[in-house]
Amino acid sequence: MKRIIMIYLVIFFGLSIQVAYPYWIWTPKVKKWVNPKTAIRPTPKEQFAFARSLYELKNYEEAKRELKKLIKSYPKALEAAESQYYLGLIEETQSNLYEAYLAYQKIIDKYPFSERIQEIIEREYKIAEAFMTGTKRKALGMALPVENPAIEILTKVIENSTYGPLASKAQYKLGLVLKGLMRYYEAEEAFNKVISNYPDSEWAKAAKFQIASCRAALSRGPDYDQGATGEAKDKFEEFVKEHPDAVLSRDAQKNIEDLKEKEAEANYNIARFYEKQKAYPAAKVYYDDIINNYPDSKWAAKALERLRVMEKRK
């Protein structure tokens, strides 16, 4: 029985050695056994060349492993920054856009000397645009229920290059993302920064329109806000006055008409309230205001009709 057990043990260890052996190779140069999976080339230049060759062969997972080994073993080498860049490229190629952004951002944070900084900012901006147009952040192929990553990425683009060529555009697009999420106060703040920080940019004019649009959206909430409606109308009128030939001025004029209609409706409802309370003088003030200040609205005719009804009651 002992002999049989010994035979099994010999076979087991023999197989174990056979399985394990290929992972360890004797290297005469350093005179020791090394594991190819964890081994690193003697210089960062050689390691990077090897990793890039794997990338060019589209062996992305192996390339990622070798690039990470370089960064870990030679963190201060010039090749470390380039390795981090290639990690971003691989993630982007594999459609892992948020992970690509994180990889690119590490270059700006850890390797500000890199010659690729402007290119990286541009890549980050394009990733943000992808998220703006509907791309979802995913894990294991499934969309994650998280805030639109475009907010974080655009904020970083602005931070990375406050007065760079993409800064004003990123600031404006940040406002659009927030507006699309109905975060109107934050959106208005973002648009205001376009005007204050980049007054001469091509986006400043559109930002003024968007501020008025945010105010208009607030006025359409479940609780009518007369102040927000008036402010929105004033902002649109200011925009039309300053930019009469702008394409957006036509939209602004339409918004002004809609807001006037809304103001007239609000005044009509107030007048009806006073009329029902038999406070006829107060009701007449509001009906007259509609007729005089909103003559083209549908509420003007209704106000005139109510005045005639009240007149008959005297």
State where each predicted segment sits.
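Positively charged n-region of N-terminal signal peptides that target proteins for export
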Residues: 1-4
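Bacterial N-terminal signal peptides
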Residues: 8-16
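Acidic, polar-rich low-complexity tracts and alpha-helical solenoid repeat scaffolds
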Residues: 19-314
